[in-house]
Structure formats: structure tokens, C-alpha cells
Amino acid sequence: MQQTSDGVNNSRELPKSIIIPPIRGEMAKLRPATCDDLQRMDELCAFDKASVITGKDSQSERAMVHAWVERSVQWSHDGFSDSKLSELCRFAGDVQSRPTIAWAIVPDMLDDVENTFGAIIGMIFLIDIDGWSRSARIQVVLGKDYRGRGYSRDAMPRVMTYGFASEPAGLGLHRIWVGVPATNTRSLSVYQSLGFMKTGTARDVLWDAQNQKYQDFVVMDTLVDEYDAIRSLDAFGLHVIEENPGVVEALSAHEHSVAIPVRRDNLDDAWPYNTSTAEGTSSKRAWWRIIGRGRKRNVNTEGKQ
């Protein structure tokens, strides 16, 4: 692994194989997805109205999810051969061949009943993982009856924390991005609250079969030095779970490790997952408006950025 003096990973290569960590949320836990979970996704009608949510038709969305899970299983079980890994790095522009990590979302409660059988309600992915640019796309696919209940808000910042954490705690990503139809205002609002910034719009690249018209595709992203794991959770009144992968590194990198003990005395005793969490109070400040102000940028001789 090649690193700079400040500890940044300069390697442009992905590992041959990976151990996908479980991740704990407040509403659900995330475990590595398996091919056996795919039938459940059909039962959940997880691909219903896909054109409205992701801009793809249901069959295309289903095929992509199957491919993502299969690639995730391969990377975490058999791994990639030297020749395959070299090909992935050399032809990073081929998004269809890039590695993927897939988690199944397992809620604590299922329809107000304890989920003793571990039934899943959807999946969350890091896809298009590009070792050369240290970039990945995040995607959530939920069952029809479990959308809009807060599962994406609970899972996404925790997966992003793992993605941005330096290796070996995380993937050492530099950029995480999302893509969504311009008409999906609910998702756009969630992504903005997580700190994503709109970086571009591809006009009329998606076909809305339901309304029989073209629609725009909005790209949003956030960078490792912009993303704040603590504030992204606080924006939704969620707790930090320090046992999750990448959290300790995130606290250290963003200088929250000192603030956490100060606030510890005021924690709700009912919170069971760790003893060093931040309070679950909603953020009152639109913090995403100030992200990136402290980033280092090149300055020309006239002092203009």
C-alpha cells in the first residue's frame, strides 16, 4: 500500500478479495447479501416503480441487482484473479465490470413484530467501485412497502462512513456519488441532507414509461474531506454506533473524538449499542451549505482560487 506523508492511500489497485463487514443501524442491521436473498427481493416487489425511483424499468433494475449481488459474492468469497483484477483497474471505465459490495437490510421489527427470522426488506450497495479514482456510487433498493420509512436515512450514512474510512478499516474512497431522476424530489432531499452536492444534470437521458416522457438525471456527490459522518447522522436525529466499521477513524479525522465524552453524560440510558455515542438530536443548522470551505485548493499567483 502506497501512502503519502499524511497517511492518504495512493494505491490505485483494489484488493483481490474483501471481507464485507456487518453494519449496525438503529432500525436495522446490514449483513453481506447472498444470492439466496434475490428471491426475497421479488417477493418484496422491490423493483416496482423503478422508473420513478432510479429511472430504469423494472426488468433492467432487477437484472442489475442480480449482477451486483453476484459480483459482491464473488469478491468476498472467491475473490478476483490477478488477471481479472488487472483488467478491472486498467479498464476502469467499464462500469459493468467494476466490483460491487452488497448488503441485505434486516430490520429489528417487521410489521410491528420482532423480526426473529431475519427477513430482509431490501438492499444497499456500493457499486461502480473504481480503484483508480477511489470512487463509488451508493444505491438503495427497498421493498415497495418499506419505502419512505427512514431505512435509507439510517443505512446510507453508515455505509458511507465505511466507504470513506481509510484502509483497512474501510475502502479508502475519495468520492461517493448518487444518481437519481430529477422528478424524484424525495430522494434528492435525503441526499442533500446527507451532504451530497449537485454536480451535474444529464438532460432527457431517462424514459419515464409511466408518464410517457423523457426526464433528466441528476448527479450528486460528496468527497472524503467534505463528508462529516457525525453531522450526517445528526441531521436525521440518529446515533453514532462506534462499533461500526470506520466510525473511530471518522471521529478522529473530523475531531469529534474529544466532543463525544463531553456529551456522554447526557445520553439516553435506553440506547444499547455503545457507551460513547452522540446524542440523537436533530441538527438545527443547514451544515451542508458550508461543506468544503476548509478544503485545500490551488491558488494562482494573483491570489484567486
Can you describe what each PLM-predicted range is?
Residues 1-145, 213-305:
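GNAT-family acyltransferases
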Residues 184-187, 204-206:
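Short glycine/proline-centered loop/turn elements that form peptide/ligand docking sites
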